[in-house]
Amino acid sequence: MNLLDIIYVRYYKEDGSSLNIGGIESYITQLAKLASSLGAKVRIFQYGTHDFFKQTDSADVYAYFKSGNKNGDFLLKKAAQKHRHDDKWLTIIANDTLIPNYHVSNSIVIQHGIGFDSCFGKNEPLLINFIKRVYQAYPIIKRMQNVDKVVCVDNNFINWYRTQTSFRDVKLIPILNFTEIGPKEEKVSDGPIKIVFARRFVQIRGTRLFAPVAKKLLSTYDNIEITFAGEGPDKEYLKSTIGNDERINFCAYRSDESISFHRQFDVAVVPTIYSEGTSLSLLEAMSAQCAVVCTNVGGMTNIILDEYNGLMVSPDEGELFSALSRLITDQKLRKFLSKNAYDTVNSSFSINKWQKSWKTIIMNNFEN
């Protein structure tokens, strides 16, 4: 039997009540569907508040209770206990933080982007700050030696890895993230220009970068509306910083409605400060024919060509304000960017392209 084991901390909520909602969980769901369609038996191993078993349309889910450190080692051993001598298996570790300190045979890890490129701590002495970064980087480099392949959601990580070591024994495979492709018909846009920030309301996603920019835009332009779509600890900060304005809206939407939700807007802003792969929020906005403004952080640099399919700026209030002002005042530019954005995701970031890449990896593993 061909077995595909996926190791992740929380695919279902720890109490087993429902599936978790998030980018990695969605990734696992699509990967399980693909592997199942190729004839593999898919099993997901995770932690829980108690042992439980669940079944989805494409996978069996085994949850185990464990006190203390919830690492990948325990789940890998649970998966190995269910192998039979005549099975062919492939183990996919869904996050590189779960790689154990020993080599895992027939294994792939999914690397979701650099997560420690923080700009905080900049008041430290330069040498101390640099040493901290080395301390953060070394465990990542080291644990990549313990898997057979590393699937990277952006080329940013691959290029960073090459700067850290001259060793090329780790097989790094770029399979960039994907999005559902929205309708090709051009959106009808009339009335005020609608801008959306559809991210989790946390500082690393740019809430505190965008809030003062949004306030300035509202005081400068009468013909705009700004929507904050999501939840998170910075919600009250956003409200208090921007103040009361009838042109500001706060809402939430279901992840499976993202494309139709984004099609209500003319402009999408993705002002990440750090820790970003190939942003699903950015891809979904492009698929919905929004003109996009994003920061030059992480894997978003693999998506946007500045002034061709979006505007790319540094994580800077002045640059962000200028870019959004251009889109507010230039309808021709908005249309040009939104069309090219749609064409980009349709050709390079579709789920069909993603499935073909993963199919090759999965089938090669079982055939060899």
Segments (PLM) and residue ranges:
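A short, well-ordered alpha-helix in the C-terminal region of glycosyltransferases
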Residues: 326, 333-348, 354-360
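Conserved acidic donor-binding segment of nucleotide-sugar-dependent glycosyltransferases
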Residues: 306-307, 311-318, 326-332
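Nucleotide-activated donor-binding/catalytic signature segment of Leloir-type glycosyltransferases, i.e.
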Residues: 236-254
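A conserved mid-protein helix/loop that constitutes part of the nucleotide-sugar donor-binding site
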Residues: 26-30, 197-216, 233-236
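Active-site proximal beta-strand in glycosyltransferases
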Residues: 92, 102-123, 130-132, 151
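Short hydrophobic beta-strand element within catalytic cores of glycosyltransferases
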Residues: 291-294, 304
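Membrane-proximal helix-turn-helix segments that form the acceptor-binding/catalytic region
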Residues: 129-150
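Acidic donor-binding loop of glycosyltransferase active sites
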Residues: 263-277, 290
